Amino acid sequence: MAATLLRSLQRRNLSSSSVSAFRSLTGSTKTSYATHKLASLTRPFSSRPAGNDVIGIDLGTTNSCVSVMEGKNPKVIENSEGARTTPSVVAFNQKSELLVGTPAKRQAVTNPTNTLFGTKRLIGRRFDDAQTQKEMKMVPYKIVRAPNGDAWVEANGQQYSPSQIGAFVLTKIKETAEAYLGKTISKAVVTVPAYFNDAQRQATKDAGRIAGLDVQRIINEPTAAALSYGMNNKEGLIAVFDLGGGTFDVSILEISNGVFEVKATNGDTFLGGEDFDNALLDFLVSEFKRTESIDLAKDKLALQRLREAAEKAKIELSSTSQTEINLPFISADASGAKHLNITLTRSKFEALVNNLIERTKAPCKSCLKDANISIKDVDEVLLVGGMTRVPKVQQVVSEIFGKSPSKGVNPDEAVAMGAALQGGILRGDVKELLLLDVTPLSLGIETLGGIFTRLISRNTTIPTKKSQVFSTAADNQTQVGIKVLQGEREMAADNKSLGEFDLVGIPPAPRGLPQIEVTFDIDANGIVTVSAKDKSTGKEQQITIRSSGGLSDDEIDKMVKEAELHAQRDQERKALIDIRNSADTSIYSIEKSLAEYREKIPAEVAKEIEDAVSDLRTAMAGENADDIKAKLDAANKAVSKIGQHMSGGSSGGPSEGGSQGGEQAPEAEYEEVKK
């Protein structure tokens, strides 16, 4: 193979510390964090037996879903609110309590700056990324620069990585599965958009680790949907059109004899329902400004109300031709309160979002071209993601592929079900299915002149391994820098940098003479390992790619501890609510008994009961569960004296020797309710 000249590096004296700054996996004896520490990590107070189930999780931008195999079929699990999907929303209230899912979404209007949604769009992204800067203008919460240059978010004055926010959602999902299965869960298959790059896949895996999950496999969302569609012996060439809350993917797969082979994939990781909501939001803000001369964009509370109204209107217009957006008291000026009342037709909505829908066409055409097939070769088009319920989207899909899309899968649940099927394959429970996925973007290195030299082209089936020999760019060069890139542009600077490392100790020689073998290895998760080896000395340097951002093991360890702390606080808060509910029920029963028997018991007994109830009420206003429990026990003990005094019979006064005939009064009508 003709040696290609590596980009020239300025020669410098390397100390051993600068070499060790790169993560070298060779010679490392450190046990994998995920398999050693976190595989067994569950909530420290869980009394459930350990399970071996591998759950399937669709960690979505807007909503998330969890499924588990029951026999040969995947089953979607309902959460504690009785819903089959959970909003991917995390909030911190004024007491810094963590809320996840529906409770977090419900309070967003009154707490917009501390309610975090759509953070999947930031996962694995740099703060300076153009898409991050665009997102900053659209959300009410703060997006901040992390010490490593990544995009993080801020709530209640504390900074969180998007992986951490994803971990809070994953923990809620994990608990949903544990409550259903009655055992602890430590293994999962988690889905990602097919067009996620290496940094985004790594960050998703980190989210699983923080949540105490050993992520057995990262699987592409369209592929997972095809798995759930094809599990019932469906065959043919399938196109999966996946338009979700934050991302768009299209994949072409061939299903034959239980083998699911991805032919090509394409997409846009910044196109989804959030953008449709934002387009409608901008329209509502401009309309109100036109009619009332008030700019609602400066009012975060009003914006959050508008955002929720926009999402509701978008959903309604999928089944009706027009809807009313009615928000009373949205603002006020010197003349008084102002109300927003707009009638929105489906055609107007379609006009507002037409440019977004048009953006799905180019990836579909590229995908067909990469798969080397024509439209007529496609047997079925599957719709995945909530946004595919929009009639205009369905119309455009029909135009692109020349046929009406299939309604063969549930757009909200198919991805999680496919992930559960992949979990069944990994466990060995599902033997008749085989999945062959692809890498969505080309991988290579920067060579002399800033050129991007590909080693692995996009849509290569994974896992895969590819090597190529390079050489030095200068005489007597004793080290080379390997800069790893991902993308489709010809110049290195225009592609996504995944990381870089140095190969040192090359014997001095004329330029072009040393033989340096660079090897790319992509695993089944789509995660990249790169090695460089000097063929003359056998010296090798190897890294699992981490971008200059990303989370270190120490940061993940710290976030795991924070997650445990939040879990403990959640448990303590639940215990406090339970004991308050118990106390409330007991007070009702005690007061009922006291009212019924007050005339038949001594005044000092009645006073003792009243004082005990008063003390219990005072304790209930506090935050100390142990104090409430003690006061509840005291109140129950006090009210038990009613039974003792009534056991003397209907004659009235207390009697030393128990009942002397007559009807014995029952024990006081109180009960302690355990919830």
Curated annotation (Swiss-Prot):
SUPFAM superfamilies per the UniProt record, alphabetical: Actin-like ATPase domain (SSF53067), Heat shock protein 70kD (HSP70), peptide-binding domain (SSF100920)
Compartment(s): Mitochondrion
Sequence ranges of Acidic residues compositional bias: 666-675
Keywords associated with the record: ATP-binding, Mitochondrion, Nucleotide-binding, Stress response, Transit peptide
Domain of life, per lineage: Eukaryota
PANTHER family in the record: HEAT SHOCK PROTEIN 70KDA (PTHR19375)
Protein name: Heat shock 70 kDa protein, mitochondrial
Lineage: Eukaryota, Viridiplantae, Streptophyta, Embryophyta, Tracheophyta
Gene expressing this chain: HSP1
